[in-house]
Amino acid sequence: MKLLTALSELISIFLFTTIFIFLARKVAIKIGLVDKPNFRKRHQGVIPLVGGISVFAGICFMFGLSDYYIPHLSLYLICAGVLVFVGAMDDRFDISVKIRAVVQAVIAVVMMVIAKLHLGSLGYIFGPWELVLGPFGYFLTLFAVWAAINAFNMVDGIDGLLGGLSSVSFAAMGLILWFDGQTSLAMWCFAMIAAILPYIMLNLGILGRRYKVFMGDAGSTLIGFTVIWLLLETTQGKTHSISPVTALWIIAIPLMDMVAIMYRRLRKGMSPFSPDRQHIHHLVMRAGFTSRQAFVLITLAAAILAGVGVTAEYSHFVPEWVMLVLFLLAFFLYGYCIKRAWKVARFIKRVKRRLRRQRKNRPNLTK
């Protein structure tokens, strides 16, 4: 595929999604598909929850525009459409967690039975021996679908973060697939980014605060499901493009945040789904950073971790078990910092004060 053709298609997806999201936000306000401020949500006014619907519309436009061969594309669109619909209903009417979990489980089973997408192997994470899962792989796949959806849902706490982290994951997968010759799957990843960008622009208020939109559960569910579908498509089979352990690096920050916060909640005797303000973005902001700075820092950290995974995938000289050990070390470092968040926050504030004093005491140079 020519690069110019690919760029023109991505620009078309971006423009279509931009127009769609402006139209969708007007409809959302009329039908009450909006987010209202409460004790946990500090935004002002009602915000349309149309980010996810717009991303899905952009992806449908992409597949209608092109003739890429994507295995089981129709099944993906049906499954994703159901999840987006249920997510939108939850955004509007607040559906119970149990109903959403059942729907996600049914979709996962359909994906495994019809598309034959499931975890059959975790690769060579124990040295020269491949870890083949057998029938247990189906149960692990069910958990992986649920985990991916909830991991991306949990990071949707400050402006731009869900869009930034998901774009990092899709960019990492897209680069690996593009240079591996899997151009159709790569374009799917890049199209997701093109469809997410208009949401990021409006969510951050780049085009004006009055046009602000949120992703909503429909969007976080769509993104998590698409990520796990692509990872199952590309990490399994004899000729897989991505090693299973690399998938951990590609979704590192959402995965680490979900595991860490659920562990803390369970230790306190709380439900793992109970809301709190202990996510990574809350802790970074508690250290003295603004919402925008936290978005940039966390997205940059995700890009660095994903970059490590992509580099290792291409180098071929780093064994998979070494990459797993390095990931676990990164996870334990993350857990250590989160557990001692107040110390980390105090250290960062001290450094920031010292830098401010140095700038203030620096003599002005005149010609």
From Swiss-Prot:
The EC number(s) this enzyme carries: 2.7.8.33
Transmembrane segments: 3-23, 45-65, 69-89, 129-149, 158-178, 187-207, 213-233, 242-262, 318-338
Cofactor (UniProt): Mg(2+); Mn(2+)
Record's subcellular location: Cell inner membrane
Principal subcellular localization: membrane
Membrane topology: Multi-pass membrane protein
Coiled coil feature spans: none
One of the record's GO molecular function terms: phosphotransferase activity, for other substituted phosphate groups
Pfam families: Glycos_transf_4
GO-annotated cellular components: Gram-negative-bacterium-type cell wall; plasma membrane
Catalytic function, reaction form: di-trans,octa-cis-undecaprenyl phosphate + UDP-N-acetyl-alpha-D-glucosamine = N-acetyl-alpha-D-glucosaminyl-di-trans,octa-cis-undecaprenyl diphosphate + UMP
PANTHER family named in the record: PHOSPHO-N-ACETYLMURAMOYL-PENTAPEPTIDE-TRANSFERASE (PTHR22926), UNDECAPRENYL-PHOSPHATE ALPHA-N-ACETYLGLUCOSAMINYL 1-PHOSPHATE TRANSFERASE (PTHR22926:SF3)
Function: Catalyzes the transfer of the GlcNAc-1-phosphate moiety from UDP-GlcNAc onto the carrier lipid undecaprenyl phosphate (C55-P), yielding GlcNAc-pyrophosphoryl-undecaprenyl (GlcNAc-PP-C55).
Family the UniProt entry places it in: Belongs to the glycosyltransferase 4 family. WecA subfamily.
Protein name as it appears in the record: Undecaprenyl-phosphate alpha-N-acetylglucosaminyl 1-phosphate transferase
Organism in which the protein naturally occurs: Salmonella typhi
